[in-house]
C-alpha cells in the first residue's frame, strides 16, 4: 500500500508540473524506452511499438514521440525500417504530450526522444520553444471530416442513395444540431489533435473570412455563440481519435456520427461493412476543413543520429511506404490527392460510395493561426465554448486507502478539479460544469456537489473523509446513477470510479438494474490501482460503452487528465 501511495504522490507532482505522458490508445508496449524486436516484426504493446529491419541488424535506433494515430500506418513504417536499415521505436502519446515533451527539451517522463511525429505541425510550432526540431516534413495527410451513418446523411439531405455527398456549410451543421437532427461524437479539443483541428476549422469558417483565426475573432461574442451552438451537438467526448472510432464501430445503433480523421472513417467503414452495417459517409465542410499533415521532425539534442533520421525519413517517402500509407487511408499526393489511385487496395479504402472525395477541390483547407492564437483558442474552448461536463466521482475510501493512498487520490482530485492546477493541463472546469463527489467504503456516503469552478468545498470534503471499512463499488455506482441530471443532453456526462480493491458483490444486481432503468447509456470510466479487480471493472466498462484506465504502474496523474479528456 505504501508503494502505491508514493507512486500516486509522484504522479500528482508530475501533473502539477505539467509534465505528463498521455497514453495513446491502440498499439499495445514493452516499456517507456521501447524494446528489442525480432527482425522485421513490429513488437507491440499499448504504448510502444518497435520496428526493426527485416534484413538484419539495424545501423541505428531512433526513439520517436509519435501520435497514437500512427499505429494504423505500421506497414508503411516497417517498409521504411527495412529500406533504411534503421530501427525505430514509436512511443504513442497525444499530440499535446508531444508538444509538452518539446517544451521540455525532447524529454518526457524520463524518456528522451530523437524525433517527433505528431498529427499536425501546429504542435511542433507551439511546443518547439527551444528550437530543437530540424527538417520536419509531412509524411502524409488526412482531413478531419464528419463521418455520418448513411441513412442519417440521406435524411439530412447531405447525401443521395448512392453515397455521394453534397457540399455542406458549417452553418448547415449548426442548423442540424439546433433542430435536434444531428448529434455527433468528437474528441476533446484540448486533449486530441482531431478535436482541436476540427474546432479551429469550425471557428475559422464561421468568421466568414478567408484568413487565419485571430485573437479579435476569439473575443467576438457572435462567433463564440455560433461555435458553442455547434458544440452542443457533441453527445460523447473522448481523449483519443482511435478509441472514438472503436466506440462508434462497436455501437453503430447508438452512435451514428463522429468527427474524426478521414483515414479513421475509412478504417471504421471496413469494420462496419464487414459486420453487415451501413458505412459512415464522409462529409467535408465546404467552407473550411482542417488537414492533418503528420510531420516527422528530428529533435537535435546533440545525439548524433541525424544521418539515421534522414535515411528513415527518406525511406518513408519511397514508393513502398507511400503505397502503404494510402492503403491505410492516408493521402500522399500534392494538395491532398492520391499518388497510387489505380492500386486495387487503395481503391478499397477511398471508395466513392463511402462519400470519399479524392479531388483536391473537396478540401477547402483553413490556414492555421499563430501559436499564441491557437493557445488562446484552446483556453476559450475549455472555459467557455465546449458543452459543459457533468462528472460524478465515485471514490474508494476503504480502509486500505489509509495514509498515503488517500492523500494521493485527494491530490489527484485537486490536480483535476482545482482550477489553477487543472489549467496547466487544459482540463480546468468551466463556469457551467458540475462535479459531484461520492465517497464509498462498505456503503456510499451522501454526495457533495460543486458547480462551476467553485470546487473548494468538494475538495475539502475529499480531504476530510477518513478511510475505513470495506470496498463496495456497486453501492457507490447506484448512488451515482441517482445523481444523473434530468437534462442529460445539456452535458457531456460521465461517472468516474476510482478503486484500489476487489469489491463486495452483494449490490451488483441492484446496480445493474439501476443502470438499465436510469443509466441512459452513459459511460462509467474506471481508474484502477492497487489491488482492484480488472474483471469487475471491465464488466462495468462493457456495460456502459466506456473503458478502464490502468493506474497500477506508471504515471497515474496522466490518467486523471486522460479521463477528463473523455468528459
Where are these regions (language model features)?
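N-terminal segment of the mature folded domain
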Residues: 36-191
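Extracellular/periplasmic juxtamembrane helices and adjacent flexible linkers that interface
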Residues: 26-42, 55-56, 299-391, 414
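Bilobed periplasmic-binding protein/Venus flytrap-like ligand-binding cleft at the lobe interface
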Residues: 161-175, 183-190, 201-202, 295-332
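Von Willebrand factor
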Residues: 384-498, 526-536, 555-559
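VWA/integrin I-like adhesion module and closely mimicked acidic/polar interface patches used
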Residues: 405, 464-467, 501-554, 560-563
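Periplasmic-binding protein-like
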Residues: 137-146, 224-230, 238, 275-305, ...
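Ligand-binding pocket segment of bilobal, Venus flytrap-like solute-binding proteins
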Residues: 209-284
Amino acid at each position: 500500500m505504501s508503494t502505491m501511495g508514493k507512486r500516486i504522490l509522484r504522479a500528482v507532482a508530475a501533473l502539477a508540473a505539467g509534465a505528463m505522458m498521455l497514453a495513446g490508445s491502440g498499439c499495445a508496449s514493452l516499456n517507456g524506452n521501447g524494446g528489442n524486436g525480432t527482425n522485421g516484426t513490429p513488437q507491440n504493446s499499448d504504448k510502444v511499438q518497435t520496428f526493426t529491419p527485416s534484413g538484419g541488424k539495424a545501423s541505428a535506433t531512433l526513439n520517436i514521440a509519435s501520435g497514437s494515430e500512427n499505429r494504423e500506418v505500421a506497414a508503411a513504417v516497417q517498409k521504411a525500417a527495412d529500406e533504411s536499415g534503421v530501427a525505430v521505436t514509436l512511443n504513442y502519446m497525444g499530440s499535446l504530450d508531444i508538444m509538452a515533451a518539446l517544451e521540455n527539451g525532447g524529454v518526457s517522463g524520463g524518456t528522451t526522444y530523437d524525433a517527433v511525429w505528431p498529427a499536425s505541425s501546429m504542435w511542433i510550432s507551439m511546443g518547439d520553444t527551444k528550437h530543437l526540431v530540424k527538417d520536419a516534413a509531412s509524411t502524409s495527410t488526412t482531413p478531419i471530416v464528419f463521418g455520418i451513418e448513411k441513412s442519417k446523411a440521406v435524411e439530412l439531405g447531405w447525401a443521395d442513395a448512392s453515397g455521394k455527398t453534397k457540399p455542406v456549410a458549417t452553418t448547415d451543421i449548426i442548423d442540424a444540431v439546433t433542430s435536434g437532427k444531428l448529434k455527433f461524437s468528437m474528441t476533446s479539443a484540448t486533449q486530441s489533435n482531431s478535436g482541436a483541428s476540427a474546432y479551429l476549422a469550425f471557428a475559422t469558417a464561421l468568421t466568414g473570412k478567408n484568413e487565419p483565426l485571430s485573437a479579435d475573432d476569439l473575443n467576438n461574442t457572435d462567433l463564440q455563440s455560433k461555435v458553442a451552438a455547434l458544440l452542443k451537438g457533441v453527445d460523447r467526448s473522448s481523449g483519443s481519435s482511435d478509441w472514438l472510432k472503436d466506440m462508434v464501430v462497436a455501437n453503430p445503433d447508438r452512435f451514428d456520427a463522429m468527427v474524426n480523421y478521414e483515414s479513421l472513417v475509412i478504417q471504421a467503414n471496413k469494420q462496419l461493412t464487414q459486420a453487415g452495417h451501413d458505412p459512415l459517409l464522409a462529409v467535408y465542410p465546404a467552407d473550411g476543413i482542417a488537414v492533418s499533415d503528420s510531420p516527422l521532425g528530428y529533435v537535435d539534442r546533440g545525439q548524433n543520429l541525424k544521418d539515421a533520421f534522414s535515411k528513415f525519413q527518406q525511406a518513408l517517402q519511397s514508393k513502398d511506404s507511400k503505397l502503404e500509407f494510402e492503403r491505410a487511408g492516408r493521402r500522399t499526393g500534392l494538395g491532398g490527392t492520391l499518388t497510387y489511385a489505380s492500386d486495387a487496395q487503395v481503391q478499397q479504402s477511398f471508395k466513392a460510395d463511402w462519400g470519399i472525395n479524392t479531388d483536391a477541390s473537396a478540401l477547402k483547407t483553413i490556414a492555421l493561426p499563430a501559436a499564441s492564437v491557437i493557445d488562446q483558442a484552446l483556453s476559450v474552448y475549455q472555459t467557455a465554448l465546449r458543452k459543459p461536463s457533468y462528472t460524478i466521482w465515485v471514490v474508494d475510501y476503504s480502509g486500505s486507502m489509509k495514509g498515503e493512498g488517500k492523500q494521493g487520490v485527494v491530490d489527484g482530485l485537486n490536480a483535476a478539479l482545482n482550477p489553477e492546477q487543472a489549467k496547466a493541463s487544459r482540463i480546468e472546469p468551466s463556469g457551467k460544469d458540475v462535479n459531484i463527489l461520492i465517497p464509498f467504503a462498505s456503503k456510499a456516503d451522501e454526495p457533495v456537489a460543486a458547480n462551476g469552478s467553485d470546487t473548494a468545498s468538494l475538495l475539502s470534503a475529499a480531504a476530510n473523509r477518513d478511510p475505513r471499512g470495506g470496498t463496495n463499488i456497486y453501492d457507490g455506482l447506484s448512488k451515482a446513477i441517482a445523481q444523473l441530471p434530468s437534462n442529460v443532453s445539456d452535458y457531456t456526462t460521465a461517472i468516474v470510479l476510482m478503486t484500489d480493491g476487489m469489491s463486495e458483490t452483494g449490490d451488483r444486481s441492484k446496480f445493474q438494474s439501476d443502470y438499465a432503468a436510469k443509466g441512459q447509456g452513459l459511460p462509467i470510466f474506471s481508474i484502477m490501482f492497487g489491488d482492484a479487480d480488472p474483471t469487475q471493472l471491465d464488466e462495468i466498462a462493457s456495460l456502459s460503452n466506456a473503458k478502464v484506465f490502468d493506474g497500477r504502474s506508471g504515471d497515474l496523474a496522466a490518467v486523471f487528465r486522460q479521463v477528463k479528456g473523455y468528459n
